[in-house]
């Protein structure tokens, strides 16, 4: 893996990922089919929305490298993506965090699980402060709750 001329070999160690928000946060929209709050039609929701307050810290769910940190015009607003490498089955794991108020990391930076990567906000297609959190396996969306602890 090469970013800005530096080569990395990433391995996702597996296990439970860190919740990307404060403990007091709550899921405001689950993964799967839902009535889109802005478009008003039934659509698949590719992640989970976790509510909170503007400026709340958003944490890296696992160790990795920042591969995207910018405003996304496709509706995600301020967005960060982290490549966590390949798991033991050779599946590439990437997490996505969207609608941030302020981005705190740049492409190519390494992060540890629990590092603050952005501040929660409501940028892009959003109805209030939250983080939209996705987990992707080889580019395909999966339910993030499968990776997160129950509490």
Task: Report the location of each language-model feature.
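Non-catalytic surface loops within mature trypsin-like serine protease
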Residues: 33, 52-54, 86, 101-102, ...
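Zn2+-dependent peptidoglycan hydrolase active-site motif and core
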Residues: 43-46, 60-102, 129-134
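Short, surface-exposed secondary-structure edge patches
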Residues: 55-58, 102-109
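Surface-exposed, glycine-biased beta-strand/turn segments
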Residues: 1-77, 113
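Ser/Thr-centric signal marking residues that sit
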Residues: 28, 56, 95, 123, ...
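Conserved, short, structured surface segments that act as functional micro-motifs
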Residues: 76-84, 89-91, 107-151
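Residue-level recognition of beta-strand microenvironments
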Residues: 30, 69-70, 100-103, 120-123, ...
């Amino acid at each position: 893996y090469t970013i800005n001329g530096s080569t990395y070999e990433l391995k996702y160690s597996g296990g439970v990922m860190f919740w990307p928000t404060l403990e007091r946060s709550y899921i405001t929209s689950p993964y799967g089919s839902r009535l889109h709050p802005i478009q008003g039609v039934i659509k698949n929701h590719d992640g989970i929305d976790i509510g909170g307050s503007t400026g709340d810290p958003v944490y890296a769910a696992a160790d990795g490298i920042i591969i995207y940190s910018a405003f996304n015009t496709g509706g995600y607003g301020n967005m960060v993506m982290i490549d966590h490498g390949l798991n033991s089955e050779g599946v590439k794991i990437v997490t996505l965090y969207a609608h941030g108020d302020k981005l705190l990391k740049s492409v190519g930076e390494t992060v540890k699980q629990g590092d603050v990567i952005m501040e929660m906000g409501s940028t892009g297609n959003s109805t209030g402060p939250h983080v939209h959190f996705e987990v992707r396996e080889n580019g395909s969306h999966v339910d993030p709750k499968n990776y997160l602890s129950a509490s």
